[in-house]
Amino acid sequence: MRVKKGYKARRRRNRVLKLAKGFRGRRKNCYRRANQAVERALDYATRDRRQKRRDFRALWIVRINAAARQNGTTYSRLLAGLKKAGVAIDRKILADLALALPGDFAAVVKAAKA
């Protein structure tokens, strides 16, 4: 007697279709298309988790550089000065300071120049 895949296959397909929820067209309800779309989406998600870190670091550097230039220095001189002064503030905090508290950022720049 032939044994069918039964509930295991259905469970696997439903898992894929659940992941494809929100997709457009046949990608949301046709298993084969949904499976391809979900695989690609998961690949992109994995890749872009790393890319997101790079993008944010670049954004922080741009913001710090812009604020540093308003205070009469450059990004590279600012970071070199901070390292020399022994000030351990990471780029994320520096960018937040530059955006939200320009006065405090100016004090940090002053400490780096000294």
UniProtKB/Swiss-Prot annotation:
Could you mention a single GO BP entry for this protein?
translation
Summarizing the function annotation, the protein's role is:
Binds directly to 23S ribosomal RNA and is necessary for the in vitro assembly process of the 50S ribosomal subunit. It is not involved in the protein synthesizing functions of that subunit.
- Which cysteines bridge via disulfide bonds? none
Sorted alphabetically, the keyword list is: Ribonucleoprotein, Ribosomal protein, RNA-binding, rRNA-binding
What CDD domains does this protein's entry cite?
Ribosomal_L20 (cd07026)
Q: Please report the name of this protein according to its UniProt entry.
A: Large ribosomal subunit protein bL20
Q: Name one GO molecular function term.
A: structural constituent of ribosome
- Pfam families given for it? Ribosomal_L20 (PF00453)
Mention any one GO cellular component term assigned to this protein in its UniProt record: ribosome
Q: Which family does it belong to?
A: Belongs to the bacterial ribosomal protein bL20 family.
